Amino acid sequence: MMKFVLFGMIVILFSLMGSIRGDDDPGNYPTNAYGNKYYCTILGENEYCRKICKLHGVTYGYCYNSRCWCEKLEDKDVTIWNAVKNHCTNTILYPNGK
């Protein structure tokens, strides 16, 4: 019985440590015009994911779990249309500003 109590305490301790630590790398998976995540084949840092992340308004991204992950990508910029609307400086699309 004592082993079960000790095991339970260890499980609770480790779960609390994980929740206290929080997210080390806040970010998100960006989505394209169809709502799908961008697929990538070269895991880790690569030019394709950096380019995708720049389209979404952040400067750094990499391939994680075969999808592009953009660090510090906010929820409002996850979809490509919202990212363009929030970061585009094209005066033809927005003649009076945003």
From Swiss-Prot:
Tissue distribution of the protein: Expressed by the venom gland.
Broad class of the protein's primary localization: secreted
Annotated site residue numbers, Important for blocking potassium channels, in non-edited version: Y48, K51
Transmembrane segments: none
SUPFAM superfamilies: Scorpion toxin-like
GO molecular function, one term: toxin activity
Asparagine amide: residues bearing it: N96
Compartment(s) of residence: Secreted
Signal peptide feature range: 1-22
Annotated CDD domains: neurotoxins_LC_scorpion
PROSITE patterns linked: LCN_CSAB
Domain free text: Has the structural arrangement of an alpha-helix connected to antiparallel beta-sheets by disulfide bonds (CS-alpha/beta).
Protein name in the entry: Lipolysis-activating peptide 1-alpha chain
Protein source organism: Olivierus martensii
